[in-house]
C-alpha cells in the first residue's frame, strides 16, 4: 500500500515524464547493459551494437508500450496484481521471461526518469516511484508462483 504522499509523488512523476521517450531509452539501456536480454527480442532485428539498439524502431515502440502500461498502472495502485494478471501470465507461460529482468528494467526506468526530470526528481519522489516500480515488478512476477 501507498501513503497519500507516496501516491501523490507517483502521480506527479508519471504525469511529468515523456512516457514514449523514457520507455524507449529504458528498454534500449536494458538490452545494452544486460546483453542476455536480447534473446527476448530476437524478432526486433539488429541489436548488435549500442547504435543499432538506440536507433531500432521496434525497441523504441516496445519500450513506449511498456511505459504506457506502467503509466496506466498508476490508476490501479490499490490492485496492481489484478491489473497485471494477464500480462504476468503471458510473460511467465508464453514468453518465459526471467522475472529478475522486471527488477532490472525498473531500476533502469528510475535512472532514465531521473535523467529527464532532473532536480524535480527529489529523493522523496524517487523513493515513492521506486516503491511503485517494485510493486509493479512483484505484480508481473505473480504468474511465476
Swiss-Prot record:
Select a single GO molecular function from the record's annotations and give it. oxygen binding
Q: Does the entry feature the keyword Iron, yes or no?
A: yes
Which parts of the sequence belong to the Globin domain? 1-145
Q: Which Gene3D superfamilies does the entry mention?
A: Globins
User: Superkingdom, according to UniProt?
Assistant: Eukaryota
Q: Which residues bind heme b?
A: 62, 91
What tissues has this protein been observed in? Answer: Red blood cells.
**What sections of the protein cross the membrane?**
none
Cellular component, GO annotation: blood microparticle; haptoglobin-hemoglobin complex; hemoglobin complex
**Annotated GO biological process:** hydrogen peroxide catabolic process
Q: Which UniProt keywords apply?
A: Heme, Iron, Metal-binding, Oxygen transport, Transport
Q: Per its UniProt record, what InterPro entries does this chain match? A: Globin, Globin-like_sf, Globin/Proto, Hemoglobin_b, Hemoglobin_oxygen_transport
Q: Which Pfam families match?
A: Globin
Q: Does the keyword Phosphoprotein apply?
A: no
Annotated function: Involved in oxygen transport from the lung to the various peripheral tissues.
Q: How does it assemble?
A: Major hemoglobin is a tetramer of two alpha-1 chains and two beta-1 chains.
Similarity section = Belongs to the globin family.
* Name of this chain's protein: Hemoglobin subunit beta-1
Q: Which organism is it from?
A: Triturus cristatus
Q: Which gene name does the record give?
A: HBB1
Amino acid at each position: 500500500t501507498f501513503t497519500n504522499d507516496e501516491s501523490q509523488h507517483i502521480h506527479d512523476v508519471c504525469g511529468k515524464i515523456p512516457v514514449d521517450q523514457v520507455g524507449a531509452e529504458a528498454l534500449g539501456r536494458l538490452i545494452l547493459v544486460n546483453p542476455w536480454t536480447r534473446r527476448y527480442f530476437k524478432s526486433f532485428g539488429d541489436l548488435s551494437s549500442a547504435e543499432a539498439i538506440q536507433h531500432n524502431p521496434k525497441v523504441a515502440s516496445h519500450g513506449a508500450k511498456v511505459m504506457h502500461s506502467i503509466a496506466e498502472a498508476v490508476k490501479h495502485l490499490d490492485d496492481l496484481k489484478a491489473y497485471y494478471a494477464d500480462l504476468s501470465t503471458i510473460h511467465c507461460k508464453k514468453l518465459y521471461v526471467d522475472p529478475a529482468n522486471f527488477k532490472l528494467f525498473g531500476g533502469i526506468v528510475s535512472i532514465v526518469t531521473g535523467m529527464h526530470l532532473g532536480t524535480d526528481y527529489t529523493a522523496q519522489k524517487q523513493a515513492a516511484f521506486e516503491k511503485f516500480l517494485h510493486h509493479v515488478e512483484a505484480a508481473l512476477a505473480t504468474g511465476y508462483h
